[in-house]
UniProtKB/Swiss-Prot annotation:
Protein name (database record): Aspartate--tRNA ligase
Sites where the protein binds L-aspartate: 174, 220, 450, 493
EC top class named in words: ligase
Subcellular location per the Swiss-Prot or TrEMBL entry: Cytoplasm
GO molecular function: aspartate-tRNA ligase activity; ATP binding; catalytic activity, acting on a protein; nucleic acid binding; transferase activity
UniProt source species: Leuconostoc mesenteroides subsp. mesenteroides (strain ATCC 8293 / DSM 20343 / BCRC 11652 / CCM 1803 / JCM 6124 / NCDO 523 / NBRC 100496 / NCIMB 8023 / NCTC 12954 / NRRL B-1118 / 37Y)
Gene it is expressed from: aspS
Function: Catalyzes the attachment of L-aspartate to tRNA(Asp) in a two-step reaction: L-aspartate is first activated by ATP to form Asp-AMP and then transferred to the acceptor end of tRNA(Asp).
Family: Belongs to the class-II aminoacyl-tRNA synthetase family. Type 1 subfamily.
Length: 591
């Protein structure tokens, strides 16, 4: 059954040669004694011709239908002038078939195997093996493969050691909900699928491996969205005896190599900006800004603190802020009805309304313009860095609500007005100097902004002492952002037990609880751990961006849907009572 070539790679260089090809039937066009078949494989499509000169092959062609698997042998010839297709690599040639064999038949597929197919998402996931035949999906998964190959090559040439860490691990209270795996041998006890290899890679540094790398699977039982899945893949790195700056330089070189290998883009890492977390929040309202959007959020709190507009004045008096976004050209684009839609949407961020004005040649117009005299209007326009024709959108109130609201409005308006700079397709940025802690509304307490093993800035270590306010501390942590997505997160780790114990105490752990959860790590630190740091880059998210997709499902072979189920295999499913009994588990019958 040996084939000589991939069908999609046949071009003019193969003219007058005999080839043997295999693949799937994309289309069949029957003209009696002349039949055309488009044969598809992973590389693309080539046109086959069957005619009465080769009667046996023609008889086979009369039987084939879409998605039949075919093997043919034939001669590569030039297409007739009216048959040339400039959209495909093989568009100037075709294969005159002399031998043909049907290797497999196919039922009529539930949707067309072609890009831009108009099919229900659940249906495509149910028949994922058919969806994966589409050229776009083939391209996406090959981009993913290239990223992994490039990463492994880079790490190998930079003396990193590829080490696997356990998938059945201990449940530790360090982040999202764990996926638990019951133990048959120890009834009532559970393993947890790892949310990251974090603790194991720190222990590997303690073991002296110095440079660790792994393409690791990780699992988090959390609510899903377009750029998250319950199981995901990260390119995980840990190093000893390197500073945060040195680690970022290493990652810059790594990302530069990947961009060249995968999308043939020459990334100038010297132009990757570094922003503090606070600067990013002030300018963009988010810790993962899309720097392809030129306009930024402006703080107008000082400008409007004595305003006659009660919403602004009361926000300032209540300890809040007033900020604005000047949307270029937005005045003509957005009607009152359009703005009402934006107002309704931002309620999910806690915003109670959306104040707005338009910048006209004669000054500001809109429902709240009457509260500002000419001098106040001029001050507003200047403070917001606005121009005639701009739409001014305001956020007033609690700082976090204002940030979330204006971040969304910045991204949404840029998309609607086509204001995303396409000349800068890959806008990377480093976000540094993060708060060590953040307040969680879900848990109603302070939690680690990254994880409990992040080293505070040297000058902030005293905040972990008794009597100090630990929430003032900042961390030696850093995130790599690309086009408004968090691509990777890393930090310098705590390598001293005294600091780690203080950190856990600040998070509410008693000494007993700390040793119950992390005793193995704390004990390891008593045996001489080196200074260490690392990062993990999300493979799924990077592949999504490099493939030009908007959902990571498009770059994962067999993903879950938004309900964390897998329509093709119908996972998760209930299991037999015998299996539950062996595990010492009781599950009530479903109603």
């Amino acid at each position: 059954m040996k084939r000589t070539n991939y069908a999609g790679l046949i071009d003019e260089t193969y003219l007058n040669q005999t080839v043997t090809l295999t693949g799937w039937v994309q289309k069949r066009r029957d003209f009696g004694d002349l039949i055309f078949v488009d044969l598809r494989d992973r590389e693309g499509i080539v046109q086959l011709t069957f005619n009465a000169t080769n009667a046996d092959a023609l008889a086979v062609a009369e039987k084939v239908r879409s998605e039949y698997v075919l093997k043919i042998t034939g001669h590569v010839i030039e297409r007739a002038e009216n048959q040339i297709n400039t959209k495909i690599k093989s568009g100037t040639i075709e294969v005159d078939v002399t031998e043909a064999e049907i290797l497999s038949t196919s039922k009529t597929p539930p949707f067309y195997i072609e890009d831009d197919v108009n099919a229900n998402e659940e249906l495509k996931l149910q028949y994922r093996y058919l969806d994966l035949r589409r050229p776009e999906m083939q391209k996406n998964l090959r981009i993913r493969s290239k990223i992994m190959s490039s990463a492994m090559h880079f790490m190998d040439t930079h003396d990193f050691i590829n080490i696997e860490t356990p998938v059945l691990a201990k449940s530790t209270p360090e982040g999202a909900r764990d996926y638990l795996v019951p133990s048959r041998v120890f009834p009532g006890s559970f393993y947890a699928l790892p949310q990251s290899p974090q603790l194991f890679k720190q222990l590997l540094m303690g073991a002296g491996f110095d440079r660790y790398f792994q393409i690791a699977r990780a699992f988090r039982d959390e609510d899903l969205r377009g750029d998250r899945q319950p199981e995901f893949t990260q390119m995980d790195v840990e190093t000893s005896f390197m500073t945060a700056d040195e680690i970022r330089e290493l990652v810059n070189a790594w990302v530069k190599a990947m961009m060249h290998d995968v999308v043939d883009f020459d990334l100038d890492t010297a132009e990757i900006p570094t922003l503090t977390w606070q600067e990013s929040m002030d300018r963009f309202g988010t810790d993962k800004p899309d720097l392809r959007i030129a306009y930024e959020i402006k703080d107008l709190s000082e400008t409007v603190k004595n305003s006659e507009f009660g919403v602004f004045a009361n926000a300032i008096k209540g300890g809040g802020v007033v900020k604005a976004l000047a949307v270029p050209g937005g005045a003509d684009h957005y009607s009152r009805k359009d703005i009402d839609k934006l107002t309704k949407y931002i309620e999910r961020f806690g915003a109670k309304g959306l104040a707005w004005m338009k910048v006209a040649p004669e000054g500001l117009t809109g429902p709240i313009a009457k509260f500002f005299d000419d001098e106040a209007q001029a001050a507003l326009i200047a403070s917001a860095d606005a121009q005639v024709g701009d739409l001014l959108l305001f956020g007033a109130g609690r700082a976090d609500v204002v940030s979330a609201t204006l971040d969304y409005l910045r991204r949404e308006t840029a998309k609607a007005l086509d204001l995303i700079d396409q000349t800068n397709p890959w806008a990377f940025a480093w976000i540094v100097d993060w708060p060590l802690f953040e307040y969680s509304e879900d848990f109603d307490r302070w939690i680690a902004a990254h994880h409990p093993f992040t080293m505070p800035n040297e000058e902030d270590l005293h905040y972990l002492n008794d009597g100090e306010d630990p929430h003032k501390a900042h961390a030696q942590s850093y995130d790599l952002v690309l086009n408004g997505y968090e691509l990777g997160s890393g930090s310098i780790r705590i390598h001293r037990m005294d600091i780690q114990e203080k950190m856990l105490k600040a998070l509410g752990f008693t000494p007993e609880k700390a040793h119950e959860a992390f005793g193995f790590l704390l004990e390891g630190m008593e045996y001489g751990f080196p200074p260490m740091g690392g990062i993990a880059l999300g493979l799924d998210r990077l592949a999504m961006l490099l493939a030009g997709q908007e959902n990571i499902r498009e770059v994962i072979a067999f993903p879950k849907n938004s309900r964390a189920t897998e329509p093709m295999t119908e996972a998760p499913t209930r299991v037999e009572g015998k299996q539950l009994n062996e595990l010492g588990l009781f599950v009530p019958e479903a109603e």
